[in-house]
């Protein structure tokens, strides 16, 4: 499903579909369901010029609900920061579902998979996030991406850097997948779509003895199983193909001028601190880059340790408002 259009002048390619649109000039984009964790109504500022929202972008293979506990903690910590004067302005908290995740509809597959169809899929998704924020009356946001959500946050920076008031990268990477990992994504997408099943991604809910204390808990396992069972197989397939065909964005790190946060769990099997610290070090154009290591934490830091992640995000918001 697609709706609306947006003109992003940073891109030079062209195409004719939402999932294969490079220029985004008069391009139909995806309609994303947006969860509002915190709203701000400022009667004295109808144009929202002094208010900058924070946008929480979820990881794969779940939806915005992975942010529930973190958003609750973020709400409380924003209240405290406002009362103490550490924040000058209130902060709306939004968490849109990606294409085919949660309450956002998945595009209909009209033909067999072709890599060309997904060459600009990430751009279309990222532009849809930007359009959602602009439709709400905001020119900029603090973009927070976890895992696959980090690809979107970095792509927003690539497409429209002036829309980035701040950026947080959690449990993610800027580089493309290694060939074997890329092939695995495409294989999972094929099985999910062909067999109408979520089973190929259910391993995200299951723990090993190397995982964090939280991830090994029955509550975490059951919650993640429920979230995954709620997903649309065609949505999982689309997002896996989008990620498999995404561009390398390591070149974006030194171009980030806004305040930034990089968050990594010590037990993350794919984006541990030794992988993410160089990403923070590469952000040489930003005056504020905070690197947070979360102990006993795996790949879903915001779900496993919501308070610690929310605390890092409040620090980022303070840096944004005082930048």
Describe the predicted segments one by one:
Residues 177-183, 195-255:
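Conserved alpha/beta-hydrolase catalytic His-Asp/Glu region
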Residues 291-311:
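Catalytic histidine-centered segment of alpha/beta-hydrolase-like enzymes
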Residues 16, 20-45, 65-144, 159-160, ...:
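Active-site loop/oxyanion-hole signature of alpha/beta-hydrolase fold enzymes
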Residues 51, 59-62, 147:
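Active-site glycine-rich loops that stabilize anionic/oxyanionic intermediates
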Residues 256, 262-264, 268:
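Short beta-strand/loop motif that positions the catalytic acidic residue
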Residues 151-199:
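Flexible "cap/lid" loop of the alpha/beta hydrolase fold
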Residues 266-269, 296-298:
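Acidic beta-to-alpha connecting loop that harbors the catalytic carboxylate
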Residues 258, 272-281:
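Short alpha-helix in the alpha/beta-hydrolase fold that links the catalytic acid
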